Amino acid sequence: MDLPGPIHDFLLVFLGSGLILGALGVVLFTNPIFSAFSLGLVLVCISLFYILANSHFVASAQLLIYVGAINVLIIFSVMFMSGPEYDKKFQLWTVGDGVTSLVCISLFVSLISTILNTSWYGIIWTTKSNQILEQDLINASQQIGIHLSTDFFLPFELISIILLVSLIGAIAVARQ
């Protein structure tokens, strides 16, 4: 999206904070329904990040596939679970939580230090000359459509069959 610098930065910070709050909601809510809705917030924020990066097709696919299908399927399956009542008491920390937090923080610090110490501008991207010509003549959405109908036809159809089988299974569980 072509926005002025301060507005773009504000939207990045706003979406980043929404992403972090949604991720914390997924982890910290004891009710699985609330966690699933927080996951929906996270996926919507990721889709809005794609819009800010001028990748509108990926953003729409993110909304349709993940928020519209996967998150609804998660909520659907959680509603059909017949589990015990959720525990109302909340233990702040256990030993396992401390060890897990320590491992996650150390992985996060090592990832950030790796990102900061990598020379990203020294990478040379090589392409074939006909790929450059093809990218000039056809826009991104048309390229995705061409690749889905030629190169990735079989995996695309297999994924659609897997989703159909999972939907039929969910309907069979709902009928019982």
Curated annotation (Swiss-Prot):
Pfam families documented for this protein: Oxidored_q3
Full protein name: NAD(P)H-quinone oxidoreductase subunit 6, chloroplastic
Membrane topology: Multi-pass membrane protein
Main location group: plastid
Catalytic activity as recorded in UniProt: a plastoquinone + NADH + (n+1) H(+)(in) = a plastoquinol + NAD(+) + n H(+)(out); a plastoquinone + NADPH + (n+1) H(+)(in) = a plastoquinol + NADP(+) + n H(+)(out)
Keyword Nucleotide-binding: no
A GO cellular component annotation in the UniProt record: chloroplast thylakoid membrane
Gene: ndhG
